[in-house]
């Protein structure tokens, strides 16, 4: 890039945010960066792409690793350290999440105001609660997310427990990256794409999650494009 990247955006399961790059400059696999292993899960390409969005230098992380893949915190968060080495400031995490509130519908975008880890977990260097530095504006909703290790979707009992903790959505990512970013002195924001509702009985598959996320990608791109100037 001709300028150091100012913002990093992490694209979650099925979220295609390539439309943010008005002027793509390069794209490289995770494995091209120190300690970064290839992504293993469908819907996670496992690349870094550099370019500009509205004149703002940007790094797009396409996909991520997960705790349920059986890797430790250092391996899980190696992409965050790679982003820090590239010189990014803010890290904006996006993810697919299940809605825990009856008013949340698939395809809605939800700004994350706090993340609960469940079971309660504190990662190395984590500075207290996982509180984003910004609330991404113009989302359909705002609230607390819960992180769970996965890979199984939640049971009815687990859904009730998470609701009791005050969570309105649940996912299997973002929390480790936020913890690593904060430990590195990087500011954060997060948006969840609601891909299913846990309040209705339904048969849920990963393919369903990916399809709903893909359908919401263009709207998420537009939302993030408008918010980028605020991430300084």
Kindly give the residue locations of the regions a language model identified.
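Generic hydrophobic/aromatic pocket-lining and core-packing "Φ" positions
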Residues: 80, 159, 175-178
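Non-catalytic positions within long, well-ordered alpha-helices that form the structural scaffold/packing
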Residues: 83-87, 163, 182
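Short acidic/polar active-site loop segments enriched in Thr and Asp
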Residues: 89-90, 168, 187
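Hydrophobic faces of well-ordered beta-strands that scaffold small-molecule active sites
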Residues: 142-146, 170, 189
């Amino acid at each position: 890039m001709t300028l150091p990247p100012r913002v990093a955006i992490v694209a979650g399961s099925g979220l295609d945010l390539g439309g943010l790059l008005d002027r793509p400059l390069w794209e490289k696999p995770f494995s091209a960066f120190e300690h970064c292993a290839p992504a293993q899960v469908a819907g996670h390409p496992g690349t870094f792409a550099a370019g500009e969005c509205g004149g703002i230098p940007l790094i797009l992380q396409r996909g991520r690793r997960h705790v349920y893949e059986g890797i430790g915190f250092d391996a899980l968060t190696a992409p965050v350290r790679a982003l820090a080495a590239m010189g990014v400031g803010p890290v904006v995490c996006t993810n697919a999440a299940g809605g825990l509130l009856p008013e949340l519908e698939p395809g809605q975008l939800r700004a994350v105001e706090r993340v609960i880890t469940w079971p309660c977990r504190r990662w190395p260097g984590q500075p207290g609660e996982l509180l984003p530095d910004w609330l991404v504006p113009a989302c359909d909703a705002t609230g607390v997310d819960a992180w769970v290790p996965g890979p199984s979707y939640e049971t009815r009992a687990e859904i009730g427990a998470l609701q009791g903790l005050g969570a309105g959505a649940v996912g299997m990512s973002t929390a480790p990256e936020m913890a690593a970013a904060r430990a590195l002195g990087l500011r954060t924001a997060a948006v969840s794409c609601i891909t299913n509702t846990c309040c209705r009985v339904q048969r849920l598959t990963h393919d369903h999650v990916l399809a709903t996320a893909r359908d919401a990608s263009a709207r998420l791109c537009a939302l993030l494009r408008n918010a980028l100037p605020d991430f300084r």
